[in-house]
Each structure stands twice: as structure tokens, then as C-alpha cells.
A protein has these predicted regions:
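FNR/FR-type flavoprotein reductase catalytic core
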Residues: 85-261
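Ferredoxin-reductase
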Residues: 2-95, 113, 149-151, 162, ...
Length: 357
């Protein structure tokens, strides 16, 4: 199962990208290179014991697969336990527990593709990995990037992006937007909005019939709006990939109507790595990941917010309700997949298969 194995990797290099963003490069030993082979767009899950509590976070891979080692980009989150530790305590030579690459923010990259990318802030992290890889390996591919930040100084990977642009003048269209810094071009002043994307489409700067795939990465509100626009113009026949960075916690109307549970105790049977285990849920509000942690049962998870899909599993028996879902597609839910971090049982017995995730 991808992303479920872990090793202690040494921090080879720390590099500040901005005052609030840092790139960590991990040294991958030769005997682990196969395990840490990744597809551009995937992420790593890190784990560290902080103040007697084991914390996990997912961070997208920023490096090109051609690199000898593997890098991630991290932005400081106000009051964020993990990012605060990274910025205040982590040093070169330290070791962190790093799970093998996981994630589904990718498509079948081919020659002669026309790809559109929209990113905000740290959402550039997986996208720069994809762009670097596509420009290097896929002939005659055209890439258009629309990248929003507050200021030039707060822009992650700006030097690397500009270098890619200079090396690929005909194949990379690089468009910066700054919300609080004046721009010579009025259109690029302010945030990336649905109105601006609509203008680009109506002005034929983005031609829906020529687009082979769209990648969206950033805050929840931006991603949801952009996804609606591109689905309207491009339809369902072409991939529109999305990844959320730091959910805005926007409450959807349907989330207000939470079903009430009548059972006091629920039995959860799980299958993982070919072994079946049982978990008891004594609290009707407890999700499956938290119950497993309480009983010292190791299950794959990371964000615990319904965003990363690391805890995706298949419901074989029983029923569950998803509290939040920002990563499962409709077809996945129809086939019985759920997110263990957000799943709360509706029946007194549930059987989940993590091996078919």
C-alpha cells in the first residue's frame, strides 16, 4: 500500500524560500531509493513527537524525480505545531520519520499536451515538481501557470520558476498575481478570481478545446471556484485535478444536517496488509482513526481533515457517514470508498478494507 511504509531520513539541506517558507531536502540512501520513487504531484507524510504527542503532516514534493534526493516545501502556519517546530528547531543532520510517497494529484503525462495550472501560495509546491518534469521529459508540451501571492517577496520558488521560464520561453507561460503589491498590468493586480479566469477563457488566452488537463492547488475557496469554472468550460472528459492546502473550513449547507447515532458501542473490523483487526468505538462521536490510535493500532493517515486521502479505504460491510470530504470523488463514494479520519459509523458493525484503497 503506497505511503504506508516509513523510515527515518536525514535532513540534508534546509533552504529558506521566503521569510515564512522553507524547503527541506532529505537524503535518500541507495537502499531506499526505490521506496521513495515518486510521481510528480505526490506528497510525503512526516511524523514527529512534539510535546509528548506524535504529530503528522503532509507536505508536497517539490523536487523533480531526476534529483538524487527528495525535497518538500513548507510554509509557516500561524500557531501551527508542526511548522513551528520545523522553523524553530529542525537542523541539518536531524532525522524525521518520513512515510513513502503517496497522493493522487497527477495524471498521465504525455507529449504534446496543453496543461493549465492555477496555484496560490504554497500550492505551488507540487505544481513546480510537475512543471519541471513535464518540460524536461514531454516533447512539445505547453504549460500555462497562473500563480497568486500577496507580494513578490512572499512568492515561493520564484527564482526556480523564472529559471524554468528562461529555459522554456516557447513552452511555459508564467503569470504572477499579487494581492497587495502594485503591478504594471492591472489584470494581474489582486487575487486570482473566477472573473479573471472567465476573462482569460473569453479572450481565448485559455482555449478550452485545446486544454488537455487542469491542475488546481491552494486554499479551499479558490480551488472550489476554479473547479466549477473549468468543469463548465471543459466538461468531464478531461482531467481537472485539485489539491487543497490548508482548508478554509467553509461550512457547506449539507454539513449542518448531521445524523444522530443511536448505538453506544460499535465494532469496526479492518483489513490492512492482509491482517484483520478489530477496533471498538465507545464514543459515538469518535472517528475510526482516533479510535485506532487510542488502541495502538497503526492505520494510514496524515491530515485528519478529509483533504489528503491517505486514509482512504473500502467499506465492505455496514454504513458510515462522512463528516467532511475534500478529496474523494463522487464515483469513489458510489463504489463504497470512505475516509477513515472523517468516517463515523451508522451501524453497529463496519468492515473496512485498507488493502483495496
Amino acid at each position: 500500500m503506497a505511503g504506508n511504509n516509513s523510515n527515518n531520513l536525514k535532513v540534508q539541506k534546509l533552504r529558506y524560500l521566503t521569510t515564512d517558507a522553507i524547503e527541506i531536502t532529505f537524503k535518500v540512501p541507495d537502499n531506499l531509493k526505490k521506496e521513495y520513487k515518486f510521481i510528480p504531484g505526490q506528497y510525503l507524510t512526516l511524523e514527529k513527537k512534539i510535546s509528548d504527542t506524535y504529530e503528522r503532516r503532509t507536505y508536497s514534493i517539490s523536487s523533480d524525480p531526476i534529483s538524487e534526493n527528495i525535497s518538500i516545501g513548507i510554509k509557516r502556519i500561524p500557531k501551527g505545531r508542526f511548522s513551528t517546530y520545523i522553523f524553530n528547531n529542525l537542523k541539518e543532520g536531524d532525522e524525521l520519520r518520513v512515510f513513502t510517497p503517496d497522493g493522487r494529484f497527477f495524471t498521465d503525462y504525455k507529449d504534446n499536451q496543453n496543461l493549465v495550472f492555477v496555484a496560490c501560495g504554497s500550492g505551488i509546491t507540487p505544481i513546480i515538481s510537475i512543471i519541471s518534469y513535464v518540460l524536461r521529459t514531454k516533447k512539445n508540451s505547453r504549460i500555462s501557470l497562473y500563480y497568486g501571492n500577496k507580494t513578490i517577496a512572499s512568492t515561493m520558488y520564484s527564482q526556480r520558476l523564472n529559471s524554468l521560464k528562461n529555459s522554456n520561453m516557447e513552452n511555459l507561460s508564467l503569470n504572477y498575481f499579487f494581492s497587495i503589491e502594485a503591478q504594471d498590468i492591472i489584470f494581474n493586480q489582486g487575487r486570482i478570481t473566477k472573473e479573471k479566469i472567465e476573462n482569460l477563457i473569453s479572450g481565448n488566452q485559455i482555449s478550452p478545446e485545446k486544454v488537455d488537463g487542469v491542475f488546481l492547488c491552494g486554499p479551499q475557496n479558490m480551488v472550489f471556484q476554479m473547479k466549477q469554472i473549468f468543469k463548465k468550460h471543459i466538461g468531464e472528459s478531461k482531467p481537472i485535478m485539485s489539491e487543497l492546502f490548508f482548508s478554509d473550513e467553509i461550512e457547506k449547507p449539507e454539513e449542518k444536517k448531521k445524523e444522530k447515532f443511536t448505538k453506544i458501542e460499535t465494532i469496526i473490523k479492518i483489513k490492512i496488509d492482509g491482517v484483520e483487526k478489530r477496533i471498538n468505538l465507545e464514543n459515538k462521536e469518535e472517528n475510526i482513526i482516533d479510535a485506532a490510535l487510542r488502541q495502538n493500532i497503526e492505520l494510514p493517515f496524515s491530515c485528519k481533515g478529509g483533504m489528503c486521502c491517505t486514509c482512504r479505504c473500502l467499506v465492505l460491510e455496514g454504513e458510515v457517514m462522512l463528516e467532511k470530504n475534500y478529496s474523494l470523488e463522487r464515483w469513489e463514494q458510489e463504489r463504497g470508498y470512505t475516509l477513515a479520519c472523517q468516517a463515523k459509523p451508522k451501524t453497529d458493525f463496519v468492515f473496512l478494507d485498507f488493502d483495496r484503497s
